[in-house]
């Protein structure tokens, strides 16, 4: 998968500035992950400075994890400004389906247009009004066969690239569907790991087209998780090793460990 290596090299060369409107739980986590990868993070939420900040940024990441009425206004305005400036937008609809507010706000953002939509099975299902359920921010009914159909259906419905995460991750642009098999089960025991994927997708989509960006972020992060587990078997030390491997991962490691293929639906 040479395009993944090329995308990573381009991130490290260009150091894209990723503007995150994200949740309180993961601000530090995702900022450090972006830095480890080679990108530059900024966490700015004030509505009054959005136009200036987005003007400086190479991509915008919207994560609704700690949503409230004030953040809702900033998020929607940020998406509108980013679209006007033709800046790529990544949306993580954290907890969509758990409450009406989260689902409504995610759909409001999608109506305005995003470049990549990344969420778990329950979140993406709820946005389509289909078969998933969401408990908190976790998906409770992942099904591999349904997940790949869901990725394709959501990509067509929302006219965007969609990444559905789970035991196997599926990415679709509404035409092709790819399965990514990298990752580790211990990720479930560390908060914010899905949000890291969203943030680094922002870095990748700043340097390559959306389908390749979504695949690259999932493969790179999945390999980093696998390598981290080789060195740390418990959640705390594993979390630290994730940063180390986002920094250490290179073309040789990607070519050796990437597990991604196009699949039929």
From Swiss-Prot:
SUPFAM superfamilies reported for this sequence: Ribokinase-like
Gene Ontology biological process terms from the UniProt entry: thiamine biosynthetic process; thiamine diphosphate biosynthetic process
Catalytic activity: 5-(2-hydroxyethyl)-4-methylthiazole + ATP = 4-methyl-5-(2-phosphooxyethyl)-thiazole + ADP + H(+)
Binding, ATP: 118, 165
Cofactor(s) in the UniProt record: Mg(2+)
Protein purpose: Catalyzes the phosphorylation of the hydroxyl group of 4-methyl-5-beta-hydroxyethylthiazole (THZ).
Name of the molecule in the record: Hydroxyethylthiazole kinase
Organism of derivation: Pyrococcus abyssi (strain GE5 / Orsay)
Organism taxonomic ancestry: Archaea, Methanobacteriati, Methanobacteriota, Thermococci, Thermococcales
